[in-house]
């Protein structure tokens, strides 16, 4: 899949600049693409784009197929006639330099409802037709998602398994009653998806026009409280009485955690999925490839075997390994989408030879993270001289790591010296540029750097601290932080290590 050496930047759209408290798909997105192009980058990596709930984690979404409506640019809606421009002039001040989820969601929700009212009363024929075509094109999932969100709001946010049994288990009469009762609310959520997809497709088209590929995340598991599970309960291991997860996903105890990690997502009923030819998974991939060029599968090892923890357990200690039909699944996916699947395998953690064999059979690139390269001896697989071939994506760090500056500062003097000994020296521009150079010089076909590392920022700017529920997903950059020196220096390194791709247009 990765047939040319190249590089790119990791930045979730919520981290883009905007004047409404959260990054969006407005001018900031287009300006960031221009920065990528000016720096001779070829890839923009993002986190999952789905609608987030409690905790604002993009890895815990109400749908694996929908787009987060809080990413919708209000300025662009005003430009397109969905809002009177004067309305946005009355916006409250957003003074928090980080994402202010509470204030941003409260304000944007109010304004988006006004856009919906404008859409319903002053609809243009062309927009009406475009909306109808969108709803038809996304009919596999959109109606279920919109009804799920409308019913959830009518239940004050309660999870679907807490609803009355008739609607929780989708009895036809209950679906009709709720659909009729919440017809306007369902239309509203369809409208938000129409706007979100419309704006994202314009962003993606501009990125592709500037020779930037969009590289996104696809978590293997979906949230229990999601339209995906509610609309397709047969695909998941659920308690038939309560609707709760009968078998929960996680990972077993290891050196880092004596009790393992219990994620709580329901694991898949792979026998049912296999009997349908993996139809739900194929639909999911097709939907994601509408707005992504490359897909990173989070927790890839779960396609070879997965750790299942019985209902009622409080930790992951008492789970078991269960086989998963990874080979059959990827064969079916290749048959549906073509053999050269644009997939990167997140193969971090405890990876067995069987997982590596599955990855290699389908020629999926794996991941290398330089922050993990200096924690053991010279056989460490993350050290660049141990990369067996170029079919890999190398990172300075990921969204789950500290920034490179923060990572280096937190190391002991002895550990810092190990890093310096390997590098030879720390370049004048700082440790972050030294690791960017190290990643760029490796044989890995694709090198990815979080924007925080390009900017040389510290621990206060990390995106996520795994295992913590608060304070994550909030970092944003200021537009003044991107400048000609940065793009020029990154372009120089990209050219120096053979990662610049030349284009004729």
UniProtKB/Swiss-Prot annotation:
It is found in: Cytoplasm. Its main location: cytoplasm. One of its GO terms (cellular component) is cytoplasm. Keywords: Carbohydrate metabolism, Cytoplasm, Glycosyltransferase, Transferase. One of its GO terms (molecular function) is 4-alpha-glucanotransferase activity. It catalyses: Transfers a segment of a (1->4)-alpha-D-glucan to a new position in an acceptor, which may be glucose or a (1->4)-alpha-D-glucan. It comes from the Bacteria. Coiled coil: none annotated. Pfam families: Glyco_hydro_77. It is an enzyme of class 2 (transferase). Its EC number is 2.4.1.25. GO terms for biological process: carbohydrate metabolic process. Belongs to the disproportionating enzyme family. This is 4-alpha-glucanotransferase. It comes from Synechocystis sp. (strain ATCC 27184 / PCC 6803 / Kazusa).
